[in-house]
Amino acid sequence: MIILGLVLVSLLASTASAIQAWMPQVITGHEGRPLSVRCHYAGKNPSKPMTMMLLKTIEGSAFRGTIVPRFKGPVYTKSSCSSGTGVFTVDSLHMADAGRYACMVSQENDPKDESVCSDYHTAYTNIVVLETRRRRSLLGPQLTPTAGPRSTQLSQTTGPLSSQESEFSVVAVRKGVKVYVGSSLHVECQFSGATAGLNISAVLFKKVGEGAYQAVSTISTSSLTTLDLSPVIEGTGQAKWCGVNATKEDSGEYMCMIGMDFPEGEEGSGDEDFSGVDFFKITVVTEPGEDADEDDYLYTSSEEEKK
C-alpha cells in the first residue's frame, strides 16, 4: 500500500530554483564518423550567464574529468530564457573517444537566496564507439563495441532516456546516493517518451514500512523540500528534488513517481498508463568533509552497491 500525499506540479507553471542538466544514459557513434552529444539544461537564471563544459571522466578519480579539445561546442539549440540544449560535436570519432563523459553546467547565484540548492549540476553519459565495417572485417568478428572501462556490452541505443522512445518511462539517475550530514542533497529522476505541452507531475516518496510509502512533502523532517521540474525537451526531462542541509533522517529507501497528464477527452486520456516509477537509496553519514554528492556521480549503480 502506498500512502499518498500527492503534490502535482505542472511543468507549465513550475519555476526552477536551481540549475540542472540531463543526458541520455548511452550515446552510440561509429568510428570515423561525426557525432553530436546533446546536454539538456533547465533552471537557468535569465539574468546571469551560464557555463557548460563537456569532460571525459578520469577512471578511479573523484576529479570530474578533462576537456577533450576535439569536441567542439557547445552550440545552444531549442533555447528559451531558462532552458535548452547544448550540442557538442566531433568531426571524426575515434575508438579512444569511448568512455564516460560529464556535462557540467554552472551559474552564479545570489548567496542570499537560501532556496537555491546548488549553482552547478553534472549529468553523465557513456559514449559507445562502434568499429567501421572495414576495420571489423580486418580484425575479426569477435570484437564487441567499446564503451570504456565503466561499461561493457552496451546496446546500440541511447538507453532508456532516448527521445526515440515513444513509451513513457522513468529512471532514477543514481540508485545509491551518499552525502555527509549538513551538506546539500539532491536526487534526480529522468523521464522519456513525453509529449511537449502536456502537464508533467512528479512526487517523491519515502519508504515508511513494509510496502508502505509516504510522500516526502508530508514528512516534516525531510531535507528534500524543493522540487524542480524541467520542461520536456526532445521527449525527455528531469525532476530534481534538493535540500541544503542533509540530516540522518534523510537516510532510507525512496521511490520517484512521474506522470504525464492528458486533458480530459483527448487521445491518451483513457485507461492507458502514462506514469512510471523507479527506486533508489539515500545514505547520510556523519563523517565531516566536503559534499560527497558529486563524487558519487562518478560510480555506476553496481559500483555504488559495492561501496
Swiss-Prot record:
Coiled coil: none annotated. Transmembrane segments: none annotated. Keywords: Signal. The keyword Signal applies. Residues 143-160 have a biased composition (Polar residues). It comes from the Viruses. InterPro entries: Ig-like_dom_sf (IPR036179), Ig-like_fold (IPR013783), Ig_sub (IPR003599). Residues 139-160 are annotated as: Disordered. SMART domains: IG (SM00409). Residues 1-18 form the signal peptide. This is Uncharacterized gene E2 protein. It comes from Equine herpesvirus 2 (strain 86/87) (EHV-2).
